[in-house]
From Swiss-Prot:
The lineage of its organism: Bacteria, Bacillati, Actinomycetota, Actinomycetes, Mycobacteriales. Belongs to the HrcA family. Keywords: Repressor, Stress response, Transcription, Transcription regulation. GO terms for biological process: negative regulation of DNA-templated transcription. The gene is hrcA. One of its GO terms (molecular function) is DNA binding. Negative regulator of class I heat shock genes (grpE-dnaK-dnaJ and groELS operons). Prevents heat-shock induction of these operons. This is Heat-inducible transcription repressor HrcA. InterPro entries: GAF-like_dom_sf, HrcA, HrcA_C, WH-like_DNA-bd_sf, WH_DNA-bd_sf, WHTH_transcript_rep_HrcA_IDD. It holds the Pfam family HrcA. It comes from Mycobacteroides abscessus (strain ATCC 19977 / DSM 44196 / CCUG 20993 / CIP 104536 / JCM 13569 / NCTC 13031 / TMC 1543 / L948).
Length: 341
C-alpha cells in the first residue's frame, strides 16, 4: 500500500480494530460514527471498495459489511507504530508472579499461565534447547551408604534430581572421589557433550569406583539425554474453544498441530534475535493445519544467550498491539528472573 494512501490505511486500521472488538463485519456508516475519520460515508465506501479490490478486506457472504483478510492484518501489523504499553502495576505484577517460581520449570509454567490469562489465547513456551544448555553444577548427596542423590543444575536454571542405587556400600573417601570425578566430567560442559563425557568415566576410574561410577553414569546419561528440544509447554488451550468460530471449521486441525508440536516448535525455534517479536499470520505459518491462525512469538533468555522461543497462538482476528506488548513483556521478565538465579 503506497504512502499516498494514508487515509485508506486509516480506514483499514479502523476496520481491523472494530472487527477484533465486535466480531461483526464492519460497514462504512459505523466507521464514520465510531472513528471520526473526517470524511463522508460515501468517501469511506469508495476507500473500502479500493481496499477490497486490493485484497485487504473481504465481504462475507451473509453481510453487507467487510472483514480484514490475511493481507489486511499483515498491512496493519507492518504499520503498527505503537503497541499498548503496560502500566507500572502490570509490569510489577508480572515480575512478582514469575519471581515466585522455584526453578526453571516453575517459572516457565507460570509464564504460560500468565500469558494465556493476559491475552486470552493459547500461550506456548519452548524449553531451553539442548544446544544452548550447559551443566552449571552436579551435586552428589549420600542418602545412605548404598544410595545416592544426584542433582544436575544447568545454566538455564533447570534442576533434575535422580536416585542411584549402588550395588555395594561406599565410604566417605570413595564418595569424595566419586563427587570429584563426576564434577570434573560434567561442570561447564554442554549437555550434548556431557552425556558422552560421563559415559566414558567408568573406563577411566579406579577399580573400587568402577561399579558406582557405572551406575551413576547410567542414570546421568538418561537424565541428560532427556533434555531434548522437542518440549513445549502450553497454557490456555481452552481459549481455542472460546474462539472456535474464528477458525472456520479448522479448530480440530489447530488442536492436532498443538498436540504434534512440530509446526509450533519450528516457529519458536526460529526466534534467535533477542527482543524481536515476530508475527506469523495464517498462511505465513507454512502449515496447512494453521490456516486461520496467527502466532506472535519472541525469544527468551538471559545474559545475552537465547534459551528458546515463546509466544501466543490464536485466530487471525487478534488484538495484535496488545498481544505483541504482552509477549514482549513476559519474555523480558523471564530473562530478568533467570539472570538473577
Amino acid at each position: 500500500m503506497a504512502s499516498a494512501d494514508d487515509r485508506r490505511f486509516e480506514v483499514l486500521r479502523a476496520i481491523v480494530a472494530d472487527y477484533v472488538t465486535t466480531k461483526e463485519p464492519i460497514g462504512s456508516k459505523a466507521l464514520v460514527d465510531r472513528h471520526g475519520l473526517g470524511v463522508s460515508s460515501a468517501t469511506v465506501r469508495n476507500d473500502m471498495a479500493v481496499l477490497e479490490a486490493e485484497g485487504y478486506i473481504a465481504q462475507p457472504h451473509t453481510s453487507s459489511g467487510r472483514v480484514p483478510t490475511e493481507k489486511g492484518y499483515r498491512e496493519f501489523v507492518n504499520r503498527l507504530e505503537d503497541v499498548k504499553p503496560l502500566s507500572g502495576a502490570e509490569r510489577k505484577a508480572i515480575l512478582n508472579f514469575l519471581e515466585g517460581g522455584v526453578d526453571l520449570d516453575d517459572v516457565l509454567r507460570r509464564a504460560v499461565r500468565l500469558l494465556a490469562q493476559m491475552t486470552r489465547q493459547v500461550a506456548v513456551v519452548q524449553y531451553p534447547t539442548l544446544s544452548s544448555s550447559s551443566v552449571r553444577h552436579l551435586e552428589v548427596v549420600s542418602l545412605s551408604p548404598a544410595r545416592l542423590l544426584l542433582v544436575v543444575i544447568t545454566d538455564t536454571g533447570r534442576v533434575d534430581q535422580r536416585i542411584v542405587e549402588l550395588g555395594d556400600v561406599i565410604n566417605d573417601e570413595q564418595l569424595g572421589r566419586l563427587r570429584v570425578l563426576l564434577g570434573a566430567a560434567l561442570d561447564g560442559k554442554k549437555l550434548s557433550a556431557a552425556s558422552v563425557a560421563v559415559a566414558e568415566l567408568a573406563e577411566q576410574s579406579d577399580d573400587d569406583l568402577r561399579d558406582p561410577i557405572t551406575r551413576a553414569a547410567t542414570v546421568l546419561v538418561e537424565t541428560l539425554v532427556e533434555h531434548h528440544e522437542e518440549r513445549l509447554l502450553l497454557g490456555g488451550t481452552a481459549n481455542l474453544t472460546r474462539n472456535a468460530a474464528d477458525f472456520g471449521g479448522q479448530l480440530r486441525t489447530v488442536l492436532e498441530a498443538l498436540e504434534e508440536q512440530v509446526v509450533v516448535l519450528r516457529l519458536l525455534a526460529a526466534q534467535q534475535e533477542a527482543g524481536r517479536v515476530t508475527v506469523h499470520i495464517g498462511h505465513e505459518t507454512a502449515a496447512e493445519q494453521m490456516i486461520g491462525t496467527s502466532v506472535v512469538s519472541t525469544p527468551y533468555g538471559a545474559g545475552g544467550a537465547v534459551f528458546g522461543g515463546m509466544g501466543v497462538l490464536g485466530p487471525t482476528r487478534m488484538d495484535y498491539p496488545g498481544t505483541i506488548a504482552n509477549v514482549a513483556a513476559v519474555a523480558m521478565y523471564i530473562g530478568e528472573v533467570l539472570a538473577n538465579r
